[in-house]
């Protein structure tokens, strides 16, 4: 007697099993505990970069935490240098020890990653130093290894095509560099002042 082919009752479980295996492969965890499919997506990328600094044993089971930021700004991350046309002209830089300042030449510490965290709000991340730019409640700029609310800046396009970066946590405080390339306190400047004007450029 000829053998009968697989019945519908046996095919369905096999198909479902194949789908489950395929989905599991797509969600395979990366070495630092984050999921490949979630790295770099808005808040997920920020959280992933912060959690990557923790020892593996200290990382939570699911490091890539989903948030309500949404994925509508996906793929808009920019590698830029922020140029402030004061004094001899300075690029914002994030030093390896977390200090923020200005440097005239293009350096590895002046290469920044601007990432959207919500509409009109970005984080500024030092590619070489691995520190986020943050602003304290007193208007002081400093670098931190972990993403917090103090790392959020409203990116405001000015009439001269430069940008101003206002602290999201402390409205009315702006990122600024002096004519000597030092940071100025955000509560002592305004967007009408040239020291707060930054041009994102490659």
From Swiss-Prot:
Keyword set includes Secreted: yes
The protein's name in its UniProt record: Fibroblast growth factor 4
SMART domains per record: FGF
Pfam family, one: FGF
Compartmental location: Secreted
Keyword Acyltransferase set for record: no
Molecular-function GO term, any one: growth factor activity
Signal peptide (residue range): 1-29
Subunit structure, as described in the record: Interacts with FGFR1, FGFR2, FGFR3 and FGFR4. Affinity between fibroblast growth factors (FGFs) and their receptors is increased by heparan sulfate glycosaminoglycans that function as coreceptors.
Biological role: Plays an important role in the regulation of embryonic development, cell proliferation, and cell differentiation. Is essential for survival of the postimplantation mouse embryo. Required for normal limb and cardiac valve development during embryogenesis. May play a role in embryonic molar tooth bud development via inducing the expression of MSX1, MSX2 and MSX1-mediated expression of SDC1 in dental mesenchyme cells.
Family that this chain belongs to: Belongs to the heparin-binding growth factors family.
GO annotation, biological process: apoptotic process; apoptotic process involved in morphogenesis; cartilage condensation; cell population proliferation; cellular response to leukemia inhibitory factor; chondroblast differentiation; cranial suture morphogenesis; embryonic hindlimb morphogenesis
PANTHER family assigned to the protein according to its UniProt record, in alphabetical order: FIBROBLAST GROWTH FACTOR
Disulfide bonds: none
Cellular component terms per the entry's GO annotation: extracellular region
Keyword annotations of the record: Developmental protein, Differentiation, Growth factor, Mitogen, Proto-oncogene, Secreted, Signal
